[in-house]
Amino acid sequence: MSTVTITDLARENVRNLTPYQSARRLGGNGDVWLNANEYPTAVEFQLTQQTLNRYPECQPKVVIENYAQYAGVKPEQVLVSRGADEGIELLIRAFCEQGKDAILYCPPTYGMYSVSAETIGVECRTVPTLDNWQLDLQGISDKLDGVKVVYVCSPNNPTGQLINPQDFRTLLELTRGKAIVVADEAYIEFCPQASLAGWLAEYPHLAILRTLSKAFALAGLRCGFTLANEEVINLLMKVIAPYPLSTPVADIAAQALSPQGIVAMRERVAQIITEREYLIAALKEIPCVEQVFDSETNYILARFKASSAVFKSLWDQGIILRDQNKQPSLSGCLRITVGTREESQCVIDALRAEQV
């Protein structure tokens, strides 16, 4: 008689799943953490809600209204969730039939699109970006049959560049009546002029992902948003958990989205952009750096000579970067979060000391 293990009882797609390798899961013992695109210092908040004996609202009214005002959309076009990652998953759960439909994304890009789909049992299709990391629209068009959700990250993680807005329009026309197009704008606060939020009236099948983890300096809060037309939001509300945001999370999110909170966020963005330009200029002068790519975000992608050795050398010194070497078209590339001036200097000094 054969023995059935617990693993044997699991779904086949889960047994075969490679989980997303988050910065924390990868570990490391560092003093300089530049691998997760977090804001380098903590922002202080005081809790004002003490009703922890009661369940929270599913969609806290103040949070929704504050975010709608900030994003320039209607409150009924906003859904709040446990980070933008939950929004990625909700869109698949609401629109994709297991074993029938597919999602499509364009590597190199954020890894949670594929993990979310594979966990649910939905097919993943990929159309790698062109050499300039813009969309291969012909390639996408050729693979759209059966695709229900298309994910496009702009600015793209990990490459840092914006997707051409005309290409977005072409994609939205290609998919009209066929699929939802999801613009992942996790880093849009660093280039707000490029947001597609103003396009919702034109495109009923457009959804936009946002987060408080980056420019709002609240990665530990786990609070994200989906912006979409009311019909899409209503469908997502059918599949979201009954209490996605705890009372303390909603409390802090509402404060972060107050007029004072928005001003503070924009000051942080200006500071990070100044620091980013300083770090880019310094990296371009370092012998072990082959190429530094332009960035519209709070991180920089660079190609290195002997990138694996450089990554390990800095890791051993307690400077933790993100290795992108295995991503399509990113051979030799490391991603560096823009931190404080002191952290930038640690990276610069360590890289200058590398023997090429």
UniProtKB/Swiss-Prot annotation:
The keyword Phosphoprotein does not apply. Its EC number is 2.6.1.9. The modification N6-(pyridoxal phosphate)lysine is found at K214. It comes from the Bacteria. Its cofactor is pyridoxal 5'-phosphate. Pathway: Amino-acid biosynthesis; L-histidine biosynthesis; L-histidine from 5-phospho-alpha-D-ribose 1-diphosphate: step 7/9. It is an enzyme of class 2 (transferase). Keywords: Amino-acid biosynthesis, Aminotransferase, Histidine biosynthesis, Pyridoxal phosphate, Transferase. One of its GO terms (molecular function) is histidinol-phosphate transaminase activity. CDD domains: AAT_like. It catalyses: L-histidinol phosphate + 2-oxoglutarate = 3-(imidazol-4-yl)-2-oxopropyl phosphate + L-glutamate. Pfam families: Aminotran_1_2. HAMAP family: HisC_aminotrans_2. Homodimer. This is Histidinol-phosphate aminotransferase. It comes from Escherichia coli O1:K1 / APEC.
